[in-house]
Amino acid sequence: MQDQEEERMITNQPKEEDLILENGLRPKFLVDYIGQNSVKERLKIFIEAAKQRQEPLDHVLLYGPPGLGKTTLANIIANEMNVNIKITSGPAIERPGDLAAILTNLAANDVLFIDEIHRLNRTVEEVLYPAMEDFALDIIIGKGPSARSIRLDLSQFTLIGATTRAGQLSSPLRDRFGVICKLELYNNKQLTAIVKRSARILDAYIDDEGATEIASRSRGTPRIANRLLRRVRDYAQVKSDGRITKRVAEEALILLEVDSLGLDNTDKKMIETMIYNFNGGPVGLDTLAATTGEERNTIEDVYEPYLLQMGFINRTPRGRIVMQKAYEHFNIPSAE
C-alpha cells in the first residue's frame, strides 16, 4: 500500500520530484511566506527579540499534517536569524553517538532541524534533554561500577522539531520546547496565491481562474498545489498553447483523476468502504485500516485531515462516521 500512496497525485507525502523542485519554490523569508498568519506573527516577534538579545531562538516545535511547510519554516527561521541549519530526521538518528556527532559540530546559534521528531528512539531522546536545557552532553565513560559521567559543553543552538503526530511526543521532550506552533490546512485564497507565485518562478503563464482551479483541488496543502501546477503545466505545454486557463486546468485535472474538491479514487474507496461495509459507521480506525488495506497512520495523517475539514467524515468516541456531504458528493443514496 505504500507504493499505492506514492503513486497518488494528491498525496501530501513528499515524492522524489517534490524534494528536488520544492527548494526552488520555497520562500526564504517570512515576508514571502503565504498563510499561517498567526504562526508567522508569533515567530516574527520571537525571532526579533532573540536577535536583539543576541541569543539563539528558543527551541521550536512545528506540528500539523504533511506538506504544510514545516521544513520551509525551519529554513526561514535560520535565514531570519542569519545562521546555518543542519537538517536531519528522527529515523536517521539511530544511536546516541549519531546525535552527539551532530550536536558537537553546531556553531553558536545554529539551527538543528529534526523532521519526524516523534520517531526518535528513547535512548537518543534522553541525550537530547540536557542538550536542549543546558546546552551540554552527558557522556558515560566506562562500564559497570567504575563507569562515570562527564559533561561536555555545547554551543548554544536552536532545535526545531517537526512532526505530524504531536501526541506521540513524550512529555519530557515536548515540555522542553519554548515555542509550539500548529500549522493548519490552507484556504483556497492562500493556495491560489501560492500557485500564482510558483507559476512565476517556473515561468509558466497562468490566469486567475486557472490558479483558483488548481488551488481548489489541492486539499489545503501547498505541496499538492505545487505538484498539480507542474502537471497542469505539462498538459498545457503539450495539449494547448502553454497557457494555464480554467479550461486547461480542468481538462488536465480530469485526466489526473482529481475531482473538483481534490478527491481521488482512493478517497472514494475509503468513503465507500465505510458506507457499504459499515453502514456509514461508526467504524474503528483499526477495523478501517484492516478493511481498506491502508496503514493506520496513513489513514490518520493522509486521508483524515482533509476529509474532516471538508465535513465528509466525523470522529466520535465510537469511531469514524460518514457525513451527509460525502453521500451527496459521491452520489450515494444515504441510509434511511
Swiss-Prot record:
Annotated GO biological process? DNA recombination; DNA repair
Positions of region (Large ATPase domain (RuvB-L)): 2-186
> What InterPro entries does this protein map onto?
AAA+_ATPase (IPR003593), AAA_lid_4 (IPR041445), DNA_helicase_Holl-junc_RuvB (IPR004605), P-loop_NTPase (IPR027417), RuvB-like_N (IPR008824), RuvB_C (IPR008823), WH-like_DNA-bd_sf (IPR036388), WH_DNA-bd_sf (IPR036390)
Q: Does the keyword section mention NAD?
A: no
Q: Which CDD domains match?
A: AAA (cd00009)
**Enzyme superclass (EC):** hydrolase
Top-level taxon: Bacteria
Specify where the region named Head domain (RuvB-H) lies, as residue ranges.
260-336
- Reaction catalysis annotation: ATP + H2O = ADP + phosphate + H(+)
Q: Write down a Pfam family by its short name.
A: RuvB_N
**In which compartments does the protein localize?**
Cytoplasm
Per its record, what are the GO molecular function terms?
Answer: ATP binding; ATP hydrolysis activity; four-way junction DNA binding; four-way junction helicase activity
Gene Ontology cellular-component terms for this entry are: cytoplasm; Holliday junction resolvase complex
Domains: entry comment: Has 3 domains, the large (RuvB-L) and small ATPase (RuvB-S) domains and the C-terminal head (RuvB-H) domain. The head domain binds DNA, while the ATPase domains jointly bind ATP, ADP or are empty depending on the state of the subunit in the translocation cycle. During a single DNA translocation step the structure of each domain remains the same, but their relative positions change.
Question: Which HAMAP family does this entry report, sorted A to Z?
Answer: DNA_HJ_migration_RuvB (MF_00016)
Name under which the protein is recorded: Holliday junction branch migration complex subunit RuvB
